[in-house]
Structures are given as structure tokens and as C-alpha cells.
Amino acid sequence: MSFFGFNTTLPKENMFPNEGQLEEDGIDFEETYDDLGNQLNEAGDELNDETFGVSAGSIGRDFDFSGTTAQASAQLEDEQYQINQQNIFAKPVKPASSELPQVSRLNGASQFPSREPASTAINKLSDLQPMASIWENIVPEKPAIIPPEVASLQDRLGAQPSEKVFSLQELEEQLLNSMTAPKPPSQPAIPIVPSEMAAQVTRENISSLDPAISAASIGNVTFGQPNIPSTTTDFAGLAAPNMVHPSQAIPNPVMQPSLVPQMPYPQNGMYNPSVAPPASLVNLFQQEQLIQNQNLDEKRQKLERDHMLMAQCAGLMTRSDKSFIARIQISQLMSEDPESDDFYYRVYSIIRGRKPSEEEASHFIQTYLGPSNNRRRGRRSENPMQKLQQQLQRLVSSAKERPKATQLSLEGALGKIAVNTVRTPRQLLNVKRPTEPASSNSSLNNFSGFSTKKDVLHAIEKVYDLLLDFEQALRKASTLETTDQEQIDTWKTTLSEKLESIWKALYINESLEASSKTRPPFISIISHPKGMRLLPRLFPHLSKEQQISILKVVVYNFDSLDIVLRGTFDVNGELPLDVVSEMSSFTQFIIPPLLTIVNELDLETINNLFSQLLNRTNAVYLIQTKIGLSFLTLFISRAEILKQSGTVNQNEKEEWENTFNVMFNRVKGHFSTVFPPPNARAYADESYPWEFLAACATAASSEQHFTLVSETRDRVLDNIITSKRAPSEIAVVRISNVNLFLNAMGLDARQLSA
């Protein structure tokens, strides 16, 4: 039944295979509109029965919607098939360039005659919706759901043209230019096929996609837009069959343009070959799909890695364990006496036998053995209070039954470490302590030397501590009362004891008894710059015998000093920097106290020390070092002073002359090596070689004077000649050094220069 005079038996897409060419004329709504709608009387509804021909009460309840719908659907399909068979090749295909797409005015009127396909017009007539002014309660039609991939492509393609609004003349000119413009040579020719085949191919390709994409594509191609030519709509509708679904993406990350299928475009009024989407747009869409898939894969892999890392630590602590630790921490923060709330302290108290009060016991149970909030469904959970009480009972009983370790069982053991478990979280270390002082004294007496530099530094620090303690006790003398003799005696006894401790810490006796193969401990101490500074502070408080003992240790082990072993110049005339620093410290802190001792010795002692120095060292090597020359000069000068004083007997003089002759004969022919090499400019003007030669010239005979002059002649003349060209300060130093040697033999530098 038709209320508005339309033929409802005609199929909706009857004219679609026939390219929309209707045999009858188009319908012009402007001519047929007779303004009858304004004459309707909508005041009352009492004539509804006469208008619709039936009454509301006569409507039955026996509806058969499925049967009627099935019959109508089958009839429509048969009619559609017959019409398609009759009109497949009824009319030739007209070129699309002869048709102009209809452009709507802004007010809804048409500029050109309508060339819309008949199927579209019939669809519009069949799908007319009642106006909202007549039917007020019409539910608005929901827009078609467009997949996000198609929507993103439409937005990119349509974003730029939509920014500018064209006028009617500009749109017409643009459409005419696009249809008449020549096709670029690089564009492949698009095959022209009948519209029936194109439509069939389009439906098949669209139906192979997802329902959402196919529905959106069909709506965009056929029914979605009016006659306004929209490039975005055409591209979206035509590119939809060639789109690759994300679930069907090929695994090859490089997209090949040649693999994209070429789809023929129908040559009807809505499609134009000149505006067909190029292959670059399809490739752009496929690249976007590939990037999205890669991003999804990266996110998925990152999520899997995070889950794997978290799974490694999963299950280490239960919720009950976490709450148990939280209760312990909170109880320690809130308690005024954290020690009494400590778990280990409570266990220790229980083992010791101290019984806690009821209040402390209740607080302990509430803190550590409280009920857990972790409820296990379907399983019986153990009571932690009972479990821990049993563990405590076993711990106490085992501690009482365990026999106490005796001293015999700990013999020869460095320590005993308990197994670190939950029940014994702390390690127990039982170290044997020395109880016999005799063993320590015997080990001290058998001490032969330090093994590492750390031991040497530790010994130096120990001596400093004892020395500071001794000096502190020495300063207490000002507070003593001179009348209290007992207090003075106690103070002297304390000083002597402290001084004896310092003497033992220096290992002087062990150094005297040390063999030549090992380095004495005292030599190791004074070889360090910090140990050298000890001697000037300690020497005034030592006795003369102790001072001579220190001198003997230095002389007997002179070749063990680093400044002697490494004190010779290399081929470049240089010395190591650390050796230079140690030589400076030795000259500043060691030689002055020893010089004080030497100046108080007799000739016999000097003779013995000088003989020991020559016997224990290599004299030729010794004269090439600064410290060696200084010690030789020290002993020779003291012996000559004693010999010329007239206080020594003839035997001592002869003994000294024999000892000096032994030294002179050993270094004979090597006196020129006492000077630094010519390339050692920093040491060229030092006076220690000339002091040694002057001491030797004083003790030498006439024949020995000739040997000294002949071996040192070149260096003497060189100093005299270069002093004439050198600055006045340097010239004075060089002339004075030469005169120091020549004056000992009764000569002068002015005689040689003349």
C-alpha cells in the first residue's frame, strides 16, 4: 500500500546495471510541489479512521513478519536477476568526459541538469525519511562506522582541501581543468571496462574486507555523498578494496609497489579517470599500517620483558611476610625502648633465662606473632604464633643441650662461622685470644724484618704514638713539686719505661743482629721520610750508648738504604724524583744527629766504624753517591781533627793511616767519578765532591796528593775557565769549591789562572 503514490514494487537498484539511464523523464520536485502541506489541519485526530481506512481496534495479533519478508525478498532477487540479464549489453559505455558532475548551490538549487544515475535517484525516493516537522519523534539515523585506518587516510587526504572554501565558479573551473588536462606519461593507462563488471568487481573486493570497512566503503561510493565531486570521498571509496587489513599484513617489512593490485575504475558519472588515486597513496597507507604494526610489536615485546623481569621476583615474599616486616618496623618506631622490642634481644633474653614480664610478653606476641591478614581460601593456614613459639622452644632447648666450647677445642682455629639460616641469621665468630705474654715476647725477640710497606707504616705510627705519650709525660715535670721526691722518682720511672717502649718499637737490637741477606727493621723505618723525622725528636732523650747503637746500625747496613742503592746518576745525568726527595730528607733529618754523635767519638771508635763501612760496602760505588761521600767525609774529617789535636797515641794514628790507605787504594783511579756527570746541570755546582777531596787531601801523603791532582785536573781547570765566563754568583761558587780542595794541599786557584 502506498500513501504518497510511489511504486513500491520496483526494486531499489533496478537501474544500477544500466548505468542509471532511466527511460522516463526525471522528477522535478519544484514543479510538482503545490503547497498542499500548508493546508493540512492538524488540530484534531478524530478523522484518522477515515484517512487510513482501518480502525485501531480491528488490528489483529497474528503477525507473520518472517514469512512475508522472505516472500518479498525472494521476489525482489528474481526480478533483479532478470533485469540484469536483459540489460548487460543493452547500451554502449559512454565516456565519462562527456558528463559533468552536478554541483549543488549553496541554497540547494542545481546549476546544471541532473545527470545522476537512476539507481541513486530511486534509492533516494525509496529511502525518503519523514520530515522532522511532521514526525517529531523520529530517531536520528546513526552514522556509518568507519574504521580508524580509513578515517585517518580520509583525514590526511581531505585536510588540506577543506581549509579553503571555493566559490561556484572556482569549482566549475577546477572540474573542467581536471577532466581536460592531459594525463602524465608516467601514469599507467587505466583499462576501461563496462560499469556492470566494474560494479561487480567493486562489490566482490569490498565484500572480502571486514564488514565495517566494506560498509563504510559502499556508503562512500554509492549512497554517502550528493552530487558534489569530493576527491576525498572518491579516494576513500576506491582505495578501500585495495587496503590491507592489519591482521592480513605481509611479514616482509619492505612494501613493494608492484605487489599492489591495480583495480579498474568504473566509467560512470561519479568516477573520473583523471582523479583516480595514485599508487603512492596506497603505498603511503600500507607504510602507515606497517609502522603501526611495528609499534604494536615493540609495545608487546616491552610488556613481555617487563612481565619477565617482574616474574623473576614474584613469590619471594607473601603478603603475610610484608605485613610482618611492616609491623616490626612500625613497632620499633613507636616504642620508647626499641632494644626491648628487638627480636634477637628477646631470643637472647630467653636463652639467658630472664623471664619477661606479662606486659612485655603480650606486647611481643602482638608485635611479632599477631594474626595475619592473608586469608587463604580453601586452604588451612598455620597459626604463625604457634609456629614461632615452637621454633623458639626448639632453639632454647638446643642451646641448653649444646656443650660449651672449651679452649682446647678452639686451638689452632681462626674462627668458627655458623651457617646463615633463618633460625641463625647472625654469624658467630670465636677468635682465639693470646693468654700467654711469653709467646708474644718471644715472637718480638725473633723479629727479623717487615714483609710489606704497610707493616713499616704501622710500625712508624706506633713509634709516633709512644713518642707523643713520652713527650706528654715529659711536659708534666713543670707540675711536679720539687719537695716531693717520691713523686719525682715515680715520674722518672714512668719516663724510663716509656722510653724503653720506644726503643723496643725501633727494633735497634734486632737490626744489629740481622744478617746481611735481610733488611733490618730500623733501616726500613728510617728509609721512609716520615720515619726520618723521628730521629731529631728522639735523639736528645737517648743515652750515649743508644745513640752509638743507632749509628752502628746505619753504618753496618749502609748499603741497604734506598738512597744509596738508587743514588747514582743515570746516562742522562738525572736521579729519580723520589730518590731526590729522600736524599733531601736524609740530609736534613738523619745526618745532623749522627754528626753530633761522630763529633763526640774517639779515634778508636771512628777507626772501627770506618773499617766496617769499607768492609760492608763497595767503596768505588760508594763514592758515586752523595750520601756515601757525606759519610766518608764525616769520618775522615773527625779522624784528622783528632789526629791533629794531639790527644791520641801513636798506635791509633798508625791504625787510622792504614785504614785510610786501604780506602785510598780502593778508589784510586776513580776519583773523577765523585763529580756529577757533565749533563747533570742541576748538581754541577754542589760542594759535596770538593769536600770529600779536601778531606782526602788533608789525610793523604805527597804521593797521594799527586794522584788526586792528576785525576781531578780536568775538572779543576774546567771550573776555573768556566767561572770567567759565568755570572758573578756562579763564578764565586765555583772558585770557592776549587779552593776548598787546593787549599788542603797548599795551593790556590789564582796560581793556576795565572
Swiss-Prot record:
Keywords in alphabetical order: Cytoplasm, mRNA processing, Nucleus, Repressor, RNA-binding, Translation regulation
Protein localization: Cytoplasm; Nucleus; Cytoplasm, P-body
Residue ranges of the region described as Interaction with lsm1: 499-754
A GO term for molecular function: RNA binding
Disulfide bonds: none
Entry's family note: Belongs to the PAT1 family.
Function: Activator of decapping that functions as a general and active mechanism of translational repression and required for P-body formation. Stabilizes the 3' terminus of mRNAs and modulates the rates of mRNA-decapping that occur following deadenylation. Might be required for promoting the formation or the stabilization of the preinitiation translation complexes. Necessary for accurate chromosome transmission during cell division. Together with lsm1, recruits the deadenylase ccr4 to P-bodies.
Protein name stated in the entry: Deadenylation-dependent mRNA-decapping factor pdc2
Organism: Schizosaccharomyces pombe (strain 972 / ATCC 24843) (Fission yeast)
Record gene name: pdc2
